[in-house]
A protein has these predicted regions:
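Charged, compositionally biased N-terminal leader segments and the immediate start
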Residues: 1-10
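Mg2+-dependent prenyl diphosphate-binding active-site environment of isoprenoid biosynthetic enzymes
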Residues: 13, 17-18, 22-254
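Mobile late-domain/C-terminal helix-loop "cap" segments
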Residues: 256-275
Length: 275
């Protein structure tokens, strides 16, 4: 995936370097503890999918400019903030194969640093000075929250179907991909057709990305996912592969399957689940 990502991003190679500068400058704080935790969070660049989408969208529609870098930075900051809060909600010890912020600095600081990052994202938004962009960001924040709450609600009730699943991943994952494309486009054009087309592209790409992540939870490993196999299943998250498996079974078969799955997860015998 990395080689393909680099190939797709060839037109914005130099722009990514400029983005890195803008992103790092946006995170500075006068509080030493915040800087320490933030540096730990961003020590590895990761794939930077969302900034790439913003930059590429602007490039497609016109020219990349200062507002594009601000948009790309605020979206990556927002993404990092949601990861910090997600790890608290999910009680996660690992993030991309490394100890989570909560594991090292505990949940109180995790939540507060996540809040700090949200505030820095808002600061970047203010610099863009665009009411349309503010509305997109507000809608994004609403969708992200609703998606996470819906996931928790359905995990507790264990009642989820394909329709609910796509609503959930659209809000908690695809919304950020869509906003990345849409905001990037807005910095380079006023053409509503282009802006909406890129927004829809981001939405579908985000859904596909989440489905791939669900599959990796079953067939992947900590080396390529940054988390142990079966992590989502252990957290009672009903992913699309599991929904399709259960859909083909009778009520009795579902109960037996869920019981066996629970026993295998408890014994960490994940190879049997893969088979």
């Amino acid at each position: 995936m990395k080689s393909m990502l680099n190939k797709i991003s060839k037109p914005i190679e130099l722009n990514l370097e400029e983005f890195d500068k803008c992103f790092n400058e946006s995170l500075d704080s006068e509080v030493k503890t915040i800087n320490t935790i933030v540096k730990y969070l961003v020590r590895k660049k990761g794939k930077r999918l969302r900034p790439r989408l913003s930059l590429l969208s602007a490039k497609i529609c016109g020219d990349i400019n200062l507002k594009t870098y601000k948009v790309a930075s605020l979206l990556e900051i927002l993404h990092v903030a949601t990861l910090v809060h997600d790890d608290v909600v999910d009680d996660s010890d690992l993030r991309r194969g490394w100890p989570s912020v909560g594991r090292i600095w505990k949940n109180k600081l995790s939540i507060l640093v996540g809040d700090y990052l949200f505030s820095k994202a808002l600061t970047n938004m203010a610099d863009i000075d665009s009411m349309d962009s503010v509305k997109i960001l507000a809608n994004l924040a609403s969708r992200l929250s609703q998606g996470e709450i819906l996931q928790i609600e359905k995990a507790l009730s264990k009642n989820i179907n394909e329709e609910v699943y796509f609503k959930m991943i659209s809000d908690k994952t695809a919304s950020l991909f869509s906003a990345s494309c849409k905001l990037g486009a807005i910095t380079a054009t006023k053409d509503p057709t282009k802006i909406e087309a890129l927004s829809q592209f981001g939405e579908f790409l985000g859904q596909a990305y989440q489905i791939k992540d669900d599959l990796f939870d079953i067939v992947g490993n900590i080396g390529n996912t940054g988390k142990p196999s079966g992590y989502d299943l252990k957290k009672n998250m009903l992913t699309l592969p599991l929904i399709y498996i259960l859909d083909k079974k009778t009520n009795l078969e579902r109960k037996i399957f869920k019981f066996n799955l629970k026993m295998m997860l408890r014994k960490n015998n994940f190879n049997k689940i893969k088979n």
